[in-house]
Each structure stands twice: as structure tokens, then as C-alpha cells.
Amino acid sequence: MKKTKIVCTMGPNTNDREMMRKLIQNGMNVARFNFSHGDHEEQKFRMDMLKELREEEHTNTAILLDTKGPEIRTGILKDGKKITLKEGETFTLTTEDIVGDNKRVSITYKGLVQDIYKGCTILIDDGLIGLRVESKTETEIVCSVVNGGELGERKGVNVPNVAIRLPAITEKDKDDIRFGVEQDIDFIAASFVRNAECVLEIKAYLKELGAPYIPIIAKVENAEGIENIDEIIRAADGIMVARGDLGVEIPAEEVPHLQKMIIQKCNDNFKTVITATQMLDSMMRNPRPTRAEVTDVANAVYDGTDAVMLSGETAQGKYPLEALQMMVHIVETTEEHLDYDSILVKAGDHLKSGVSSAIGYASVLAAANLNARCIITPSVSGATTRVVSNLRPRQEILGITPNERTLRRMSIYWGVRGLKSLEFHTTDDICSGAIDLAQAKKCVDSGDIVVLTAGIPSPSVQREKGSVSNMMRI
């Protein structure tokens, strides 16, 4: 079984029930619903289908809602036709609501005029088109075209190294999150997170909706997010390394070391981390990936990512199933070559103080020394399972919980197989019940050595933030 989890983006391809079923059967752990596209009716159709299929297939496939976020886009064009911008020409961005042409186009963020300055760079459509600001009025930004090309409708606008004063959460995001809560989603991927305040605003809104339990994965997509990465990691439940916009906002050659830095920081802080964007991009058109793409996926696994993500590859590419199967194959092959002993030593060197960390590390160390069959982590909240997962043991981790939401959240935890249990009330119940369940699911056999770690309520143990792991048995 692969340990690194895979997030697949839903789209036109997955309107086909059997295609969605095949993705579930072939290794998709989390289904991503991108709310930059489609309406609620379309998204509900796919979510309902996924829920039906995971029941039929007896899986815990989680649902991740990816918000559109406070992004800037260009407006519509005359007759919907693309325009051609040529190097050296003058092109104007306007906050007025107009139908664009080859002279000017509207933008969705009216405050951009105040945020930018003469001489700064504006990039459109993932950086394919580059503009330099020459002058501005109250409603217009007059630019010269530095890098020309074809411009279509509603393309993304990036302004590198400029602090944009967009709201942390838009009205559309609120509407989409409200809809997601009604649909019992498992994660929110918050787009264009710039600081901890962005995360806290979304958490406050979730509390208003009566859903404070939904984890927030912060998407770091610009220089401001990188600058504030430590406070964002503290505030969020996880991080998505969104390399698409990130590689536009900052020099592309900076992305690899930033990816490694973010993954390491998330590992050190027991936070989920997803590596995303263009991982097998060529498989949108071709049945096989490039060697560079294979290496990219493998390096993310070596770096310590919890999950890797497929975007357009599964949403609308020509080879959605083949892309997933290739991702699984790359991940499994790479994991065969991981140096688990070195990983464990490194984890010990960076171990944070606290009972949960100490017990988790002792459990993984014992499992390694005894060549245990697996590590069993009974947990209502999933906190114990998360700690053990972050230590990256060679052994399979059985995350056992009576909580359906926790079970689905475990779908993104590295190395974890989630199992649904009954409620346990005593320490003996926890231990015997968890082992009985593991045997019933054929995860262990009689005579196998297993390590079990859990959190047992105890007045003598200082409770850390959230739950505390304070018991280990062999």
C-alpha cells in the first residue's frame, strides 16, 4: 500500500460515474472540488455521486473544497474571442465594467489601481503575458506589453512583489463554504492565504456556521504568504504548496527550495502538507509523463509531503485514470527507496517537547526495533494518528476511530489506513477492541508484534493543545 496520499481534482471527466469509481478503486484518497469553476448544482451532482460510490466501494474518500479566493481576473472580451497582444504595444487595464478588446480589458479588483505603482510588473494568464505599468488614473492602469501573446477571457492576474489589499474571504467564498458545510465536506483549501489573519477569518466564519471542526489547508501562492509562512502554519491545519501561482509571483527557480522548506516546516509542526500543480501536466495530452515530471513527484515524496495532487490531469485531461495509476506507481516505487532509519533519526533531532511527541516517537522507535507488523492508533480526534504519521514509520499505521469525520480526515495522513470502530470506554477496551478490529480486517495475524499508542484521560498528565497521546503498549 502506498503511504503518500493522492488528491484528485474533479471536473468534466468525473461526471462519468464509472470514471469516478475507477479513480476511487485505483488510489484516489481525497477528491478536490475546485470552486473557481462550476456552480453549486454542478458541484453537488459530483459530491453526491462521490458519496454514493464511497459507500458502494467501502472507502473513506474525503472531500476537499478549494475556494476561488480573493483572486484578480480579467473580464470578458468582444464576442468571447481571444485578442493578441504584441510586444511594445500599449494595453490598458480598467476597473470599469466593459467588454474588452485589443486596447483594454476590465479587471475584477477595483483597488488594484491604488496598490500598484509606475514601473511594476503585472502578469496575466500564469505569467504568459507580461505588462509594465507606465501610468495610472483613478480607474485605469496604462501598461506597455513586455511579453505578448493571446489573451482569453477571465484570466488570472498576478502582481509580483506588491502587497495586494484583497479581502481574506470574499462573498463568493462565504457562499461556497456555507454550501460545503451543508454537503458535509472534510477539508477547505483556502486560496491565496497571505497571513494568519486570513486563516483566522475563515475559522471564525466556520464557527458562525457551526462547523469549527473542518480543517483548513492554507494555499501559499505568493511572496507575502512565503514571508508569513511560520504564522500561517501555526494558524492552519495544513499547507498546500500551490506551485502554479507561486511560480508566477516569485521567480520559478526559487520554487524548489521553497517547496522543501515548507514541507520540512509542516513536518516539524505536525501539520499536513500537500504538494500540488502541474505534477503530471503533460498527461493531460499524452499517455505517459515526461521524465522530469516523474522526478518531480518522486522528489516531493523524498521531501516528506503527506500528499501529491493531480489537477487538470484528472479533471479534464485525456488520460485521467492513467495519470492516477502513474502517480501511484511513482509514489510506491519511491517509497521502496526511502531511508526510514535516517528519517527516524532526523525526526528525533527535531522532536518538539511534549507528551504526545515523546510517546509518538517512542512508539515508532519501538516498532522499528521490534520489526512490528503495524502501529495501531485508536483516536477519536485523530491527533494521535497525526503525530505518528508525521514521524514517517516504515510500518503501516492503523488509524482506528469511532468518528466518521475523523475517519475521512485520516485519508490525507501519510501512511495511515483508517478503520471505523465502536466507542471504547476503558483502556482495556481500547487495546483489545483495536487489535480485534485489526485482525478482523486482516491487517494483523496471530503472533504478530504490534505497537499500540493512544490518549487515555489522566488528571496527572498536563493536557496539550487538543488531545494528548500518553499511552503505549506492545
Regions found by a protein language model. Name each.
Residues 1-474:
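Non-catalytic helical/linker scaffolds that mediate oligomerization, partner binding
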